From Swiss-Prot:
Organism (species): Leiurus hebraeus
One example of a Gene Ontology biological process annotation: defense response
Protein name: Beta-mammal/insect toxin Lqhb1
Record has Metal-binding as a keyword: no
Places the protein is found: Secreted
Family: Belongs to the long (4 C-C) scorpion toxin superfamily. Sodium channel inhibitor family.
Domain notes: Has the structural arrangement of an alpha-helix connected to antiparallel beta-sheets by disulfide bonds (CS-alpha/beta).
SUPFAM superfamilies: Scorpion toxin-like
Coiled coil: none
Top-level taxonomy: Eukaryota, Metazoa, Ecdysozoa, Arthropoda, Chelicerata
Record's signal peptide: 1-19
């Protein structure tokens, strides 16, 4: 019984480590996925990419996703956008 509880707790910890919050990445352009006050489209796009919840971050005009894998998120360090849309 202790082993089962240990395995469940370990699995939950691993799942938590592999997810992150951030702007969704448009893999074709390397840019953030843009939006204009459309939470529904950002939420569905986030869920398609295995995230929990997504919304349109108004000031950045980009979809923000919570709980998505890091491979689906835009990162400043690996930014390849250069103004392309």
């Amino acid at each position: 019984m202790k082993i089962i509880i240990f395995l469940i707790v370990s699995s939950l910890m691993l799942i938590g480590v592999k997810t992150d919050n951030g702007y969704l990445l448009n893999k074709a352009t390397g840019c953030k996925v843009w939006c204009v006050i459309n939470n529904a489209s950002c939420n569905s796009e986030c869920k398609l990419r295995r995230g929990n919840y997504g919304y349109c971050y108004f000031w950045k005009l980009a979809c923000y996703c919570e709980g998505a894998p890091k491979s689906e998120l835009w990162a400043y360090a690996t930014n390849k956008c250069n103004g392309k849309l």
